[in-house]
Amino acid sequence: MKIAIGSRPYDGPWGGGNRFVTALCDALGKAGHRVVHSLSDSDIDIILIVDPRMRSPNVTFGPGGIMRYLTWKNPNAIVVHRINECDERKNQAFINDKLVRANLIADVTVFVGDWMKDLPVWQRHLREPHFVIHNGADTKIFNRQNFRPWGGQEPLKLVTHHWGYHPMKGLDVYEAIGRMIGRDVWKNRLQMTYVGNLPGGMSLDGIRHIAPLNGVALATELASHHAYVTGSINEPGGNHQNEGALCGLPLLYRNSGCLPEYCEGFGVAFEGPNDVEAGLGRLMRDYSQLVARMPLYPWTANRMTSEWLSLFERLHKDRKAMRTRRNLWRHPLKALIKQISF
């Protein structure tokens, strides 16, 4: 098969979406398929929308280009839309609308978590067929090789990492942990590292902050800690918790967004800054049992890409039937609006 992916992978710390594209391109190539990042060829079998926003620097084509491609060059291609973003993630009011408009061109929709699929916007607009394929991290990089569990006597070392610097990434929780570290009861029992970007001029008191890392350097840093914390609000299905967990670190995670479906059984949930201290106490109490479970953590890149390849193969096999269900012009005005860059 020839698969056109509308996002080009970048080297370096670029966030979870970039890691997804990198892993999928690698898996497709190893399976003997050809990956392109444009719509120049007339024999594309599958078109994958990763991000419909043409203003993003790594996006190579958008819904308007796909519409023209299907209409004038190759109506046989099947369009798959991967959805890993939402208004709720950053308390915005325009992402969902862009995704819904882009989704009109899609034959198939894939969400990165059940929480995403169940959002009100998709309960109103979602069409069959749709699937959920969870994100996964690369175990060749993120693994337990260098992990040393907490012994219970030394300070417990927490870590988190984020490419994006929006406050809803959990800064309220990390600030609360910083205040905890400043109290006598925790001063010699707890340390924390934040890897990644922060809003301009912001610092996290009591917390070690280092610049974004990628690949082996990131995995090495994560594995030098004892537990992973994520305070992300309405997380649509990030990869950061996967990378920490696959390095062997039990998870202290916010009960929000997709995090519970990724983290349940492999850590301790909390609601926010007011109860993160209690959650940390439970994690410390149950640490040995949680560490023993971490080798069973399921969300790997191998699992994720296997599910994607299986889906592509089924779609390619059923492409004639899928084409008969397609109606690109069922909403003429919205179809014309697609010709304007998102």
Predicted stretch roles:
Residues R148-K169, E175-R179:
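Conserved donor-binding/catalytic core segment of Leloir-type glycosyltransferases
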